[in-house]
Amino acid sequence: MNILLVLIGILLFEILIISHEWGHFITAKTFGVKVNEFALGMGPKIFSVQKGETNFSIRILPFGGFCAMEGEDETSSNPRAFNNIKPWKRIIVLAAGATMNIIVGFIFTLIVIAQNNSFVSTTISGFAENSVSQTCGLQAGDEIIKVNGTHVFTPKDINFAILTSDKNSFDFKVRRNGEKTEVKNIEFEKLEKEDGTKALKVDFKLGKTQKNFLTVIKEAFLDMVSTVQITFLSFLGMITGKFSLKELTGPVGMVSMIGSATSKGLEVSLLAAINNML
């Protein structure tokens, strides 16, 4: 892989780490907790500077980072130790990392979404010739809201529900003329690719939503919600045995994926990072 792409992947990954640890740092300082060190990276130090009571360091391995608070890992008698502040403050400090990831993720998503001139919606605009789904009862204008029980916020939720299903048929819940309707037992045509892998022919088309300020905000929010849902369902699938560990991407795989995506453009690269943020 091109070294530049690897570096871009590492940079994006570190932005996520910095935002996460900064959330812990800024809330800890707000509540008067003593922060001994704020580190970017892991392993031996290659650079450090002392500012006030906190040592800021950069470490040799560009993966991870930490915010070392007094009394975080062991009991301390210091009145400014993490273990000595009120429980509700500890909860806020601990939750601040994930909160910052959500905020930064939303900003990244907003930047990516804003590049599009229009957005693919979850509303059916038409069908392929001899469409099975149309014969089963789906209609143009139907807004897809569930597939096999999975909530649909964006088109990628439809893809996820279909690709990860262990059933041969699909139950759709749609909003039609303002009312919710169910269309059950849709069996898409099975296809076999040149490499021998099997696939399903999804025979309906989705419409588009025009870009304006409100739709950009809405699409960014829905994309974040969709990402959270897919992440949760993926981990749930791993726990229940539906998915294997090999299907989950760790930090190293994430950098490789981001690097590969970068060669296809900024939009794909940022989305790769965002989808691994939570």
Stretches found by the model and what they are:
Residues M1, L5, G9, K86-L94, ...:
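Residue-level signature of transmembrane alpha-helical entry/exit and packing/kink sites
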Residues I85, A128, E187-L278:
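Functional transmembrane alpha-helices
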Residues S133-P155, M224:
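Conserved PDZ fold ligand-binding element
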Residues Q139, I145-K146, D157-K205:
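PDZ-domain C-terminal substructure recognizer with occasional recognition of PDZ-binding tails
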